[in-house]
Regions:
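C-terminal catalytic/motor cores of large multi-domain enzyme assemblies
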Residues: 1-235
């Protein structure tokens, strides 16, 4: 996102006790649902009620995305034993619910955590960095084509930065949530960072926990009122 002054920042909170009860209930039924999946399912449902959250800016014009996808990073172990990260992009469809969303995420994570597996995004990045002089030149060309709306569909499908939502679960590495900028490259309009649980100081029930969600939003894709309605739907 080239206009950094067009970003808004807010911290939302998810009641961990409510989420935990639901997770435990489903676990007794034989279904394992992570916290991040619950957040994503709530976000997706709220988007269906407030579709403008899925718009993006390209070349100073507002566009409505014709699909919904989410990008996130997972840790994996390479074939040589080194720890590494890989980006995943998962597409949701109108008929998806918490269970189909959970299944899609589980399948994507399982496939991309295989040591010998490089997803298409990994392969694209490996190609770029295979020739020392190529990355800078090619990235410059790709960014220019992106700004002009000339980027081929194949590259957009490979890019985790062309997404409805980018989310990171820092609680998984016992880290506080952060405000992560929306990327200069791509069409990410909202970035959500989940942090490690904190005491529920808002209600004064310090023995109960909340999950902080640090949110960075492109203010150009919808009005403040529309953002407020969207986050009310998420809650």
């Amino acid at each position: 996102m080239s206009c950094r002054d067009a970003q808004n920042f807010i911290t939302e909170y998810a009641d961990m006790e409510v989420l935990r009860r639901y997770i435990q209930e489903k676990r007794r039924e034989g279904v394992r649902i992570p916290y991040m999946t619950l957040i994503l399912a709530a976000y997706f449902k709220a988007y269906q009620e407030n579709p403008k959250i899925n718009r993006f800016i390209m070349n100073s014009k507002i566009y409505q995305r014709n699909h919904f996808c989410v990008s996130f990073v997972i840790l994996k172990t390479r074939a040589d034993g080194r720890a590494d990260e890989t980006s995943i992009k998962v597409f949701f469809e109108d008929g998806d619910d918490i269970f189909s969303i959970n299944r899609k995420i589980e399948e994507a994570v399982a496939q991309n955590q295989v040591a010998a597996h490089n997803n298409n995004t990994d392969k694209f990045a490996n190609f770029l960095f295979a020739i020392p002089i190529l990355p800078g030149l090619l990235f410059g060309l790709v960014k220019l084509m992106d700004r002009c709306g000339l980027l081929p569909r194949k590259i957009i499908d490979l890019s985790p930065f062309h997404t409805s939502l980018f989310i990171t679960n820092l609680a998984s590495i016992n880290t506080n949530s952060i405000f992560h900028h929306c990327y200069e490259f791509g069409t990410t309009g909202v970035f959500v960072s989940m942090g490690k649980p904190i005491a529920n100081y808002r209600s004064g029930e310090y023995n109960k926990k909340m999950i902080p969600l640090s949110v960075v939003m492109d203010e150009r894709i919808c009005t403040g009122h529309e953002y407020a309605l969207f986050w009310a739907s998420v809650r």
